[in-house]
Amino acid sequence: MILLAVLFLCFISSYSASVKGHTTGLSLNNDRLYKLTYSTEVLLDRGKGKLQDSVGYRISSNVDVALLWRNPDGDDDQLIQITMKDVNVENVNQQRGEKSIFKGKSPSKIMGKENLEALQRPTLLHLIHGKVKEFYSYQNEAVAIENIKRGLASLFQTQLSSGTTNEVDISGNCKVTYQAHQDKVIKIKALDSCKIARSGFTTPNQVLGVSSKATSVTTYKIEDSFVIAVLAEETHNFGLNFLQTIKGKIVSKQKLELKTTEAGPRLMSGKQAAAIIKAVDSKYTAIPIVGQVFQSHCKGCPSLSELWRSTRKYLQPDNLSKAEAVRNFLAFIQHLRTAKKEEILQILKMENKEVLPQLVDAVTSAQTSDSLEAILDFLDFKSDSSIILQERFLYACGFASHPNEELLRALISKFKGSIGSSDIRETVMIITGTLVRKLCQNEGCKLKAVVEAKKLILGGLEKAEKKEDTRMYLLALKNALLPEGIPSLLKYAEAGEGPISHLATTALQRYDLPFITDEVKKTLNRIYHQNRKVHEKTVRTAAAAIILNNNPSYMDVKNILLSIGELPQEMNKYMLAIVQDILRFEMPASKIVRRVLKEMVAHNYDRFSRSGSSSAYTGYIERSPRSASTYSLDILYSGSGILRRSNLNIFQYIGKAGLHGSQVVIEAQGLEALIAATPDEGEENLDSYAGMSAILFDVQLRPVTFFNGYSDLMSKMLSASGDPISVVKGLILLIDHSQELQLQSGLKANIEVQGGLAIDISGAMEFSLWYRESKTRVKNRVTVVITTDITVDSSFVKAGLETSTETEAGLEFISTVQFSQYPFLVCMQMDKDEAPFRQFEKKYERLSTGRGYVSQKRKESVLAGCEFPLHQENSEMCKVVFAPQPDSTSSGWF
């Protein structure tokens, strides 16, 4: 019985796990010439998979394969010769007809005589146990041509038994899995495992990033230990995470078929493959089977200065709200990435002051060593005469998609040196914090420059003596989000003066859930409940928000709810609005809040019926099963009806990944004297102040001040024009993905996705004693352009797919307060402007000689504007504030 079981297992394993035959790989018969046909084709489209919507090309040929030598000591050690003949290049889509770029052109005209000759020269492949030992070709052949031959040769590497292993072929060192059957072998290559040197980068934030998926399956039909047919298919799909309409697909196929065999060259005798190769042709040299990098040369392309002359008109200040400005900004960045320092410096020095800020945006966004050296040489940080340019450079550094240690080192050097403007010095440190976080997210926390920057931030905060320095380092820490900085933030949050305490608390607000430990919550509870000292309302409410948003305990929630009713009137209303917003929006804390509210002591009419005008509301801008865009607006007033803080946030979520798109906070304090009102508890001695702070795409910017001090306030009230103050304005490279792919056919593919925007965020605070009314305005104007460019290049023919998606949008928040009576009237409005939405598509096939086929499409629509809903109480209040005035029918004195 045991013997039968053993025999059965042996039979099953040999039948299912290997192809019939005695070798571990392909084996050629002696003195035979195998004549095959070969073709490789590539298709590009937007993922629809329809041939008529695709662009691409096919390279085909006859192939002769012969065994030159077999090791007398082992059958599985072979040297084979592979020769391509009768090469042809044609369209995959035969519907091109007269539009075909290949029509009437011979292969030598398409490829060039030298390239064609090189492609048809034989290559040698040394196989041991079916795996490539060495690949031999001639020196000084074009890399692109050698890659095509590598792609064909790699098909002959296989094994005839099931299993998983690592192989080196044209794709690199890859993990492959073989599934062997009686007369068939399926080879699955894990393309994401392939180790091959290729340039590329991507945006680390998942929301703004690009997702890709690649597959490779090769099917071998085997007869007598040799292939009678091979079919390989490789696909690359990619898509922009937050906008799924932006996607693309590359399909590469190879097909090899045996047509016949005939008498071939006699087997050469010898014990070493090297001696045989030398005897065949001494000009053969061993080269890597792994695909090599090549660059297609641009013939007659304009210089950087010529390109800039045609681009600069689109980047004039008056044109920045147009999509063509962003489109040209993105295109120019691509040219800057191949430019030398001297070329870049030349155009910087020649430009005028109106266009220079936009040029600085582009040069900094290029993120190359040459562009960084050029901009650092150009900007003089010791002078305060070019503050706008210095600030634009620093913010472009903060928004950098793939910053490196070199950039961080440059900022540290500038900070340690002489800086003419205190505002610029502060901005350098704030952006240093941003770069630390981005490099740490990309596993660069142990880089020397990052370690130095951490010490600079934490050490500077510890030793800071001036209030301005403390604020600077806290803002840097708010961007860096260093776990080791939390104790310092807690210290300043609990013991610091009002503005410093508030800044430290809002910095803690940006940390992820795992960092808001029980110890952190203990300190925040002490701040909220004022166990050790009296705190301003802004600090207390920020502390409560952190507790409620980070897995609060039952007692945390209960104590906060019990405090409602005992707080100053407007803070009471604000905290009540926060709790109601948690319940209405089904935030994570909503379940535990509902549990606590079941207790009568926490949930009673007296506690939840207090009047006031402060509010908090969260809503959806857009929602789908995989993503969501949310907005939140909360406003806290003083007891006298004057704004203390308004906070407008926009978030984008994809799955569990999030992006803090924007935050605009307007703060005011110490304005009660203007209307002879009594300040709230703990705020009796505050200086008059109003200012604005912004976070943009996860980067905290340097706050701006409307006025500081009573005399400054009065002078600005008397001379006020109502014009908004800009917080940030410029061109930003937001999405930046570049990927170079080595297709197993030997062709080279590139995927480029770029997203840029022209942005202008401004704010204003208007105050009228005559009408006893104040208005707060925040305007967001954004023009967004996202471009994709997919190409497959063989050096003599290129196919490409370019798309562009663009829109121009506006979002305005207005808060109107009438404090001529109490309770005062408050109306909040949040409006989104009507926005055009345009999509462009361009597909092309182009020969290196210049002849091309182009197909273009355009689609336009309009996204309707809307007013975002806030709570019902606000709607009722707005009807009163903006009640229609009765028509006057009197025409005389009486």
Curated annotation (Swiss-Prot):
Entry keyword annotation includes Disulfide bond: yes
Transmembrane residue ranges: none
Signal peptide per UniProt: 1-18
Compartments it resides in: Endoplasmic reticulum; Golgi apparatus
Mutagenesis or variant effect for residue 297 to Q: Does not inhibit apolipoprotein B secretion
Pfam families tied to this protein: MTP_lip_bd (PF19444), Vitellogenin_N (PF01347)
Alphabetic keyword roster: Disease variant, Disulfide bond, Endoplasmic reticulum, Golgi apparatus, Lipid transport, Lipid-binding, Signal, Transport
Outcome of swapping residue 780 to Y: In ABL; no loss on localization to the endoplasmic reticulum; does not reduce interaction with P4HB/PDI; inhibits phospholipid or triglyceride transfer activity; inhibits apolipoprotein B secretion
Consequence of substituting residue 169 to V: In ABL; no loss on localization to the endoplasmic reticulum; does not reduce interaction with APOB; inhibits interaction with P4HB/PDI; inhibits phospholipid or triglyceride transfer activity; inhibits apolipoprotein B secretion
A single MF term (Gene Ontology): phospholipid transporter activity
InterPro entries: Lipid_transp_b-sht_shell, Lipovitellin_superhlx_dom, MTP_lip-bd, MTTP, Vitellinogen_b-sht_N, Vitellogenin_N
Stated consequence of mutating residue 528 to F: Does not inhibit triglyceride transfer activity
Effect caused by changing residue 878 to S: Inhibits triglyceride transfer activity
Catalytic activity from the UniProt record: a 1,2-diacyl-sn-glycero-3-phosphocholine(in) = a 1,2-diacyl-sn-glycero-3-phosphocholine(out); a 1,2-diacyl-sn-glycero-3-phosphoethanolamine(in) = a 1,2-diacyl-sn-glycero-3-phosphoethanolamine(out); a cholesterol ester(in) = a cholesterol ester(out); a triacyl-sn-glycerol(in) = a triacyl-sn-glycerol(out)
Main location (coarse class): endoplasmic reticulum
Stated consequence of mutating residue 528 to H: In ABL; does not reduce interaction with P4HB/PDI and APOB; inhibits triglyceride transfer activity
GO cellular component, one term: Golgi apparatus
Function of the molecule: Catalyzes the transport of triglyceride, cholesteryl ester, and phospholipid between phospholipid surfaces. Required for the assembly and secretion of plasma lipoproteins that contain apolipoprotein B. May be involved in regulating cholesteryl ester biosynthesis in cells that produce lipoproteins.
Clinical disorder: Abetalipoproteinemia: An autosomal recessive disorder of lipoprotein metabolism. Affected individuals produce virtually no circulating apolipoprotein B-containing lipoproteins (chylomicrons, VLDL, LDL, lipoprotein(A)). Malabsorption of the antioxidant vitamin E occurs, leading to spinocerebellar and retinal degeneration.
Subunit structure: Heterodimer; heterodimerizes with the protein disulfide isomerase (P4HB/PDI). Interacts with APOB. Interacts with PRAP1.
Name assigned to this protein: Microsomal triglyceride transfer protein large subunit
Organism encoding this protein: Homo sapiens
Gene designation: MTTP
